[in-house]
């Protein structure tokens, strides 16, 4: 699949997730088979750009693959400025967030709240597309409520404004992450526009990936929550799409290697004083299958030292040897 001048190595994309898809996680997903990874959402509000969190999110160099940065906001001028600044910092694709259902984001008329205002959507899209010389993509939901699914209208508008690819999550804003994603709306959009369509929502295993591609006709898949603690899902899905066969479960030794590498990278990226806090949620996701009683996770979450975290993980996996 192509996005503008860029040829993706496959049709699997790691979704942008706030507080999760930082550079260490994106790098790991790429190494585990993702064809593209998208950064955490960056606010277009320049007042927050000086925070430590924003400064780290604006570091786009020294990572593999096509550097794709997602921006969020509701002011067309601010969004255009944010796009320009991120391109100057190394972004090769700009993705616009109109899919986030979080109240904190929607209260500022950003994310999926924008779907109620097609005229504002148009102004933002035109502003960003005209501001940069790299491809601009868009992520949306199917609408703002089940009775107000307007993704076909937004998709056609996006194509007219010069958007190079469109990701659709198969729920409305009102649905949050409740219930099941639906793919009829994504299929309808695919039949109405010619830009690449990326299907998103509840793609949790290779069989589901194949089924969603076949049903919607989508050009690619975006995977988010299913990759938390399981970044090798991209490799599993790609192997199944290529061969029709399932890979065997990842050996425990490989899980250990990936987890410990990920934790070290988090310590290095955020600094040991903060990295150990960020690592806690990732370790919890990795070990959901292996530590169902939560005892180790509770013990691990009480550790307040980076090196002690790594020692605890070594001891934990030794018990399985």
UniProtKB/Swiss-Prot annotation:
GO terms (molecular function) for this protein are: flavin adenine dinucleotide binding; FMN binding; tRNA binding; tRNA dihydrouridine synthase activity
Q: List the disulfide bonds.
A: none
Q: Which cofactor does it need?
A: FMN
NADP is among the record's keywords? yes
SUPFAM superfamilies found in the cross-reference section: FMN-linked oxidoreductases
Q: Where is the active site?
A: 100 (proton donor)
Q: Which PROSITE patterns does the UniProt entry name for this protein?
A: UPF0034
Reaction equation(s) it catalyzes: a 5,6-dihydrouridine in tRNA + NAD(+) = a uridine in tRNA + NADH + H(+); a 5,6-dihydrouridine in tRNA + NADP(+) = a uridine in tRNA + NADPH + H(+)
For this protein, the Enzyme Commission number is 1.3.1.-
Its top-level enzyme class, in one word, is oxidoreductase
| Key word NADP present | yes
Residues bound to FMN? 16-18, 70, 139, 200-202, 224-225
InterPro entries in UniProt = Aldolase_TIM, DUS-like_FMN-bd, DUS_fam, DusB, DusB-like, tRNA-dHydroUridine_Synthase_C, tRNA_hU_synthase_CS
Q: Which UniProt keywords apply?
A: Flavoprotein, FMN, NADP, Oxidoreductase, RNA-binding, tRNA processing, tRNA-binding
Q: Which Pfam families does this UniProt record tie to the protein?
A: Dus (PF01207)
Q: What does this protein do?
A: Catalyzes the synthesis of 5,6-dihydrouridine (D), a modified base found in the D-loop of most tRNAs, via the reduction of the C5-C6 double bond in target uridines.
- Family indicated by similarity: Belongs to the Dus family. DusB subfamily.
Question: What HAMAP family does the record point to?
Answer: DusB_subfam
Name this polypeptide is given:
tRNA-dihydrouridine synthase B
| Originating species | Salmonella typhimurium (strain LT2 / SGSC1412 / ATCC 700720)
């Amino acid at each position: 699949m192509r996005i503008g001048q860029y040829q993706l190595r496959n049709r699997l994309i790691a979704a942008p997730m706030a507080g999760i898809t930082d550079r260490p996680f994106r790098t790991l997903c790429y190494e585990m088979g993702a064809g593209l990874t998208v950064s955490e959402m960056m606010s277009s509000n320049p007042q927050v750009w000086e925070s430590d969190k924003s400064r780290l999110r604006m570091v786009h160099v020294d990572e593999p693959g096509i550097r794709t940065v997602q921006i969020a906001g509701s002011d067309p001028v601010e969004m255009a400025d944010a796009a320009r600044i991120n391109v100057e910092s190394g972004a090769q694709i700009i993705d616009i967030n109109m899919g986030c259902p979080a109240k904190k984001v929607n209260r500022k008329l950003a994310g999926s709240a924008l779907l109620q205002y097609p005229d504002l959507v148009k102004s933002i899209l035109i502003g960003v597309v005209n501001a940069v010389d790299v491809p601009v993509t868009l992520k949306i939901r199917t609408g703002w409520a089940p009775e107000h699914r307007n993704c076909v209208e937004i998709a056609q508008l996006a194509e007219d404004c010069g958007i190079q690819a469109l990701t659709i999550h198969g729920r409305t804003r009102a649905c949050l992450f409740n219930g099941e994603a639906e793919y009829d709306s994504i299929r309808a959009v695919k039949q109405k526009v010619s830009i690449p369509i990326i299907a998103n929502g509840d793609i949790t295993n290779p069989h589901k990936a194949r089924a969603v591609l076949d049903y919607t006709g989508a050009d690619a898949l975006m995977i988010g929550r299913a990759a938390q603690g399981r970044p090798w899902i991209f490799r599993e899905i790609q192997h199944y799409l290529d061969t029709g066969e399932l890979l065997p479960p990842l050996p425990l030794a490989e899980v250990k290697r990936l987890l410990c590498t990920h934790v070290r990278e988090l310590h290095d990226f955020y600094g040991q004083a903060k990295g150990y806090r960020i690592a806690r949620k990732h370790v919890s996701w990795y070990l959901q299958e292996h530590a169902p009683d939560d005892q180790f996770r509770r013990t691990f979450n009480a550790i307040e030292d980076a090196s002690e975290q790594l020692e605890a993980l070594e001891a934990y996996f030794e018990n399985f040897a």
